[in-house]
UniProtKB/Swiss-Prot annotation:
Species lineage: Eukaryota, Metazoa, Chordata, Craniata, Vertebrata
Any one annotated GO CC term: cytoplasm
Glycan attachment sites: 528, 922
F5/8 type C domain segment(s): 383-540
Protein name (database record): Adipocyte enhancer-binding protein 1
Source organism (scientific name): Homo sapiens (Human)
Family statement drawn from the similarity comment of this UniProt entry: Belongs to the peptidase M14 family.
Domain of life: Eukaryota
Pfam families: CarboxypepD_reg, F5_F8_type_C, Peptidase_M14
UniProtKB keywords: Calmodulin-binding, Cytoplasm, Disease variant, DNA-binding, Ehlers-Danlos syndrome, Glycoprotein, Nucleus, Repressor, Secreted, Signal, Transcription, Transcription regulation
Length: 1158
């Protein structure tokens, strides 16, 4: 009876235990059932399921009843069933979990609570969810345990079958399993998982992605929170959690949130037997999961612990496909590859493969990954960095240091690549850095002032015609503070770099691996001669753009073609510009070079191909030396700029193009450029490509017209016999066998064809503006004496410098300053000269003869042979700058180039015509005070560049009467209109008559001389009266000298008259400066009159004059001169030859002044 009475009590206790969440009555209620289940389950499972048995729940036979029990009271039966189920679940999962995975589990899982799927013992709802997965299995074994609550635990084993890691766990092994659970919890945020109760629902969702399972899981989450058992983790999941940090694990949770597709991926992959082996350790962890619950969510690549349904409840802004983008921002490249590769292997999502295909390639196969790696490694080839700016002087002098220097002229600042020696060697400007002694501790250091990736060094020997010094081997060191230095090694020892074998050829020494540092040092090891070297450093700046030293750096804003152009590229670019702007551009050729390459020119004007009346013509030329390529590239950039800005409506460019005819010639020496381009920007020496193919220097191969002009000026032939402008070319220079380059002949023909007004040639190697004269003129004795006296007084030698100046010196200086002041670097005085001292004094301009005197230059020839004022622009120290320097150089020169072109509209302009309006060509326009004129063009128009001011301008032409007027020039851009109308004269007829008479000279008739007989008689009387007065004066002087005593020294008399001659103003105070008789002094003043009469009378007596002139000359000489007058005339002629002294009075009016002064 006691046993009978105790039965209901035991059943009640069991029910209470089942209701308690923390209770573990499973052993009491399910011992028999577990043993029966194990007998059948172990017989079916292979050795592998033994591991799963730890986690797998009991067989799924009681699933139908469990559903009813759950419907009646889920909370009460769940704990009890959970305790009974785990042993049976493990058996059923091992057998049928693989066969019946997805379809049945979701239905039963919906009925049960979401937690028990992985923890069969504690969570009956898991069994309820999983028995659906294995209803056939449960049907086999439900007969064994239909009456008992064991049916509910049988419902759990089917879930465990689909989720083998989470379902199988016998009660006996549970304590041992708890030791394994603590491993995964630390990396996972357990506290967040507990409230979510991800155990059952996550496992069910993982096994069956059906929507019903998710819905029920969410509904039952609050109830099973107390009984929650965390799902078993796959061994791979545990490793992943240990490898990655918490923030990375969180990102994984965010990624799977939106995509349900990824949930299905692990479900299909992980039910395989290998996955069942992994969960074996996980069941041990089930005991502790309530204390340290592990988040079921795992990376979408792994299926055991991947709890996506719980993350659906959480909000993440990163979608499943886009998770790669946030990873790209947070993760490194290695982390991205590690996370992406497993995703592709396990899940192989189409979205990810598509992204990789778009970025790296189209193949979705595994070899594609190898290809991606190859593409990533290809850019790791040797980085080619540009020069840091040693040659171009971007590296300032204070950034270069050395251990010592031989003397001041051989300091570290002279150690730049292609540095040239001064005018004389052994001065303060020599051609290299030389150390003080031959010790091997010498070094030269460069500070880049920013973090730089160094890739190589270019070395060169000393520039000298006497010494042969260069470094053959050297070491390289790097530092970030100039205190601690690290030598470049090859892995075993300090790496030795091989230098030069001669003093001129640059040699590149590349670093096998780039080095990032701020300072670089060169330690010479061996050398030839003295320890001297020049160098350039190759490096890329890695400092941020906002660095201190980069704040003021120039950055190009124009979208132009910044690269070096070969001959074909140049021709193609000019063609493209012409196609873009066909209405304002025209391409033509000046001629051909000695190798047959055409010298192309680009014309930019609103009416290309024609000279418009009143429109000045301007020219820019470059490439006159083949290795000076900066000007070549600047003109190509200028073509593009003018074309694009004109199309875009830039008012400044439109005004310039519409009012000016611009000619741009980028390469006057195409043969030389091809030679220089073969060596590149840094490896051609100073002279490679400078000359033409025939060996001519185009800049100095023009006719020497300076000597012709200066010789005529010394003979006083200018401007009557020799003009001061438009001098003709000597015939010897034009002969076919003359040694003149082909390019120069083409340039001269081009100059004569177009009426250029202003021009400039762009050169390199220096940083200044040079203006004529380029040829030095030997100063006269007076100028040398004045210069010596000025030097003694400490004044400037202006007298000597004036000998090198042109008549338009002030205008040339204005033009030079207009370019230099608009240039960004020419007027910076701290930069100094490139090769020697700064001849410009910080102004950026210099007279060519004072700086570098040369003969036969293009500037002097253009000034003396044409109307064009031409200057030379030396744009930089580096003749052949690197391609990376072009944007900066364009910004430095752009404004200056435009400003100089606008100067062509300064001064005066106009048209010279006759009274009928017919234009007069070759008329001369002269300006008072400027001994240099200009000629009118074929249309009668002219342009004269003048500084602001007021000028007296005269226009004269052969056969026309000269005309003069006053013209004002303002400071504003815009020439003053100053037209001339010339009237015809009879000089043309006179010259024809003279030609008929043998071109004899025509006597000049002074208009002030008397023409009538009465006037001539009156003049004779006046002359006779003056002669009498002079005779009386001479007698008085003679009497005064004779009355002196013997003690008086006669030589003292001559100096006294000399003083009176210079100081007295009254006419009668003059005394002849010499001791000659009074006749000599008198005839000196009177000689001019009598000689003029004689020159005019001699043709009357000796030759027969034409009838036309007889009527003019006969009345003049009707009256015969008196005999005394004729005798005096002959005496005066003889005395004039003897004395050689003559006063400047040459007219009759002068005679009256002489007599009055006398």
């Amino acid at each position: 009876m006691a046993a009978v009475r105790g039965a209901p009590l035991l059943s009640c206790l069991l029910a209470l235990l089942a209701l308690c969440p923390g209770g573990r009555p499973q052993t009491v209620l399910t011992d028999d059932e577990i043993e029966e289940f194990l007998e059948g389950f172990l017989s079916e499972l292979e050795p592998e399921p033994r591991e799963d048995d730890v986690e797998a729940p009991p067989p799924p036979e009681p699933t139908p009843r469990v559903r009813k029990a759950q419907a009646g009271g889920k909370p009460g039966k769940r704990p009890g069933t959970a305790a009974e189920v785990p042993p049976e679940k493990t058996k059923d999962k091992g057998k049928k979990g693989k066969k019946d995975k997805g379809p049945k589990v979701p239905k039963e899982s919906l009925e049960g609570s979401p937690r028990p799927p992985k923890k069969g013992k504690e969570k009956p709802p898991k069994a309820t969810k999983k028995p659906k997965e294995k209803p056939p299995k449960a049907t086999k074994k439900p007969k064994e345990k239909p009456p008992k609550a064991t049916k509910k635990p049988k419902e759990k084993p089917p879930k465990a079958t689909k989720k083998p890691p989470s379902g199988k766990r016998p009660p006996i092994l549970a304590p041992s399993e708890t030791l394994e659970w603590p491993l995964p919890p630390p990396p996972s945020p357990g506290p967040e998982e507990l409230p979510q109760e991800g155990g059952a629902p996550l496992s069910n969702n993982w096994q069956n992605p059906g929507e019903e399972t998710h819905v029920e899981a969410r509904e039952h989450q609050p109830e099973p929170e107390e009984e929650t058992e965390q799902p078993t983790l796959d061994y791979n999941d545990q490793i992943e959690r240990e490898d990655y940090e918490d923030f990375e694990y969180i990102r994984r949770q965010k990624q799977p949130r939106p995509p349900p597709s990824r949930r299905r991926r692990p479900e299909r992959v992980w039910p395989e037997p290998p996955e069942e082996k992994a969960p074996a350790p996980a069941p041990e962890e089930r005991i502790e999961p309530p204390v340290k619950p592990l988040l079921p969510p795992l990376p979408p690549d792994y299926g055991d612990g991947y709890v996506i349904p719980n993350y659906d409840d959480m909000d993440y802004y990163f979608g499943p496909p886009p998770p790669q983008k946030p990873d790209a921002e947070r993760q490194t490249d290695e982390e991205k590859e590690e996370l992406k590769k497993p995703k592709k292997e396990d899940s192989s999502p189409k979205e990810e493969t598509d992204k990789w295909a778009v970025e790296k390639g189209k193949d979705h196969k595994e070899p594609r990954k190898g290809e991606e790696l190859e593409e990533e490694w290809t850019p790791t080839e040797k980085v080619k960095c540009p020069p840091i700016g040693m040659e171009s002087h971007r590296i300032e002098d204070n950034q270069i240091r050395a251990s010592s220097m031989l003397r001041h002229g051989l300091g570290a600042q002279r150690g730049r690549l292609n540095m040239q020696t001064g005018a004389t060697e052994d001065d303060y400007y020599d051609g290299a850095w030389c150390a003080e002694d031959d010790a091997r501790t010498q070094w030269i250091e460069v500070d880049t002032r920013r973090t730089t990736r160094f890739t190589g060094v270019i070395t060169q020997g000393r520039d000298s015609s006497i010494h042969d010094d260069f470094v053959t081997t050297f070491f390289v060191g790097f530092s970030n503070d100039s205190q601690t230095w690290v030598m470049y090694t090859n892995g075993y020892e300090e790496m030795t770099f091989h230098g030069n074998v001669d003093k001129d050829t640059p040699v590149l020494s590349e670093l096998p691996e780039p080095v990032v540092a701020r300072f670089i040092r060169i330690y010479p090891l061996t050398w030839n001669g003295s320890l001297c070297m020049r160098l350039e450093v190759l490096g890329c700046s890695v400092a941020p753009v906002y660095s201190y030293y980069a704040q003021n750096e120039v950055v190009a804003t124009d979208d132009l073609d910044f690269r070096h152009h070969s001959y074909k590229d140049m021709r193609q670019l000019m063609k493209v510009v012409n196609e873009e702007c066909p209405t304002i551009t025209r391409t033509y050729s000046l001629g051909k070079s000695s190798r047959g390459l055409k010298i192309y020119a680009m014309e930019i004007s609103d009416n290309p191909g024609e000279h418009e009346l009143g429109e000045p013509e301007f020219r820019y030329t470059a490439g006159i030396h083949g290795n000076e390529v900066l000007g070549r590239e600047l003109l190509l950039l200028l073509m593009q700029y003018l074309c694009r800005e004109y199309r875009d409506g830039n008012p400044r460019v439109r005004s310039l193009v519409q009012d000016t005819r611009i000619h741009l010639v980028p390469s006057l020496n195409p043969d030389g450029y091809e030679v220089a381009a073969q060596m590149g920007s840094e490896f051609g020496n100073w002279a490679l490509g400078l000359w033409t193919e025939e060996g001519f220097d185009i800049f100095e191969d023009f006719p020497d017209l300076n000597s012709v002009l200066w010789g005529a000026e010394e003979r006083k032939w200018v401007p009557y016999r020799v003009p001061n402008n438009n001098l003709p070319i000597p015939e010897r220079y034009l002969s076919p066998d003359a040694t003149v380059s082909t390019e120069v002949r083409a340039i001269i023909a081009w100059m004569e064809k177009n009426p250029f007004v202003l021009g400039a040639n762009l050169n390199g190697g220096e940083r200044l503006v040079s203006y004529p004269y380029d040829m030095a003129r030997t100063p006269t004795q007076e100028q040398l004496l004045a210069a010596a006296m000025a030097a003694a007084r400490g004044e400037d030698e202006d007298e000597v410098s004036e000998a090198q100046e042109t008549p338009d010196h002030a205008i040339f200086r204005w033009l030079a300053i207009s370019f230099a002041s608009a240039h960004l670097t020419l007027t910076e005085p701290y930069r100094g000269g490139c090769q020697a001292q700064d001849y410009t004094g910080g102004m950026g301009i210099v007279n060519g003869a004072k700086w570098n005197p040369r003969t036969g230059t293009i500037n002097d020839f253009s000034y003396l042979h044409t109307n064009c004022l031409e200057l030379s622009f030396y744009l930089g120290c580096d003749k052949f700058p690197h391609e990376s320097e072009l944007p900066r150089e364009w910004e430095n020169n752009k404004e200056a180039l435009l400003t100089f072109m606008e100067q062509v509209h300064r001064g005066i302009k106009g048209v010279v015509t006759d009274e009928q309006g017919i234009p007069i060509a070759n008329a001369t326009i002269s300006v008072s005070g400027i001994n240099h004129g200009v000629k009118t063009a074929s249309g009668g128009d002219y342009w004269r560049i003048l500084n602001p001011g007021e000028y007296r301008v005269t226009a004269h032409a052969e056969g026309y009467t000269p005309s003069a007027k006053t013209c004002n020039v303002d400071y504003d851009i815009g020439a003053t209109q100053c037209n001339f109308i010339l009237a015809r004269s009879n000089w043309k007829r006179i010259r024809e008559i003279m030609a008929m008479n043998g071109n004899r000279p025509i006597p000049h008739i002074d208009p002030s001389r008397p023409m009538t007989p009465q006037q001539r008689r009156l003049q004779q009387r006046r002359l006779q009266h003056r002669l009498r007065l002079r005779a009386q004066m001479r007698l008085r002087r003679l009497n005064a000298t004779t009355t002196l005593g013997p003690h008086t020294v006669p030589p003292t008399l001559p100096p006294a008259p000399a003083t009176t001659l210079s100081t007295t103003i009254e006419p009668w105070g003059l005394i002849p400066p010499t001791t000659a008789g009074w006749e000599e002094s008198e005839t000196e003043t009177y000689t001019e009159v009598v000689t003029e009469f004689g020159t005019e009378v001699e043709p009357e007596f000796g030759t027969k004059v034409e009838p036309e002139f007889e009527t003019q000359l006969e009345p003049e000489f009707e009256t015969q001169l008196e005999p005394e007058f004729e005798e005096e005339e002959e005496e005066e002629k003889e005395e004039e030859i003897a004395t050689g002294q003559a006063f400047p009075f040459t007219t009759v009016e002068t005679y009256t002044v002489n007599f009055g002064d006398f």
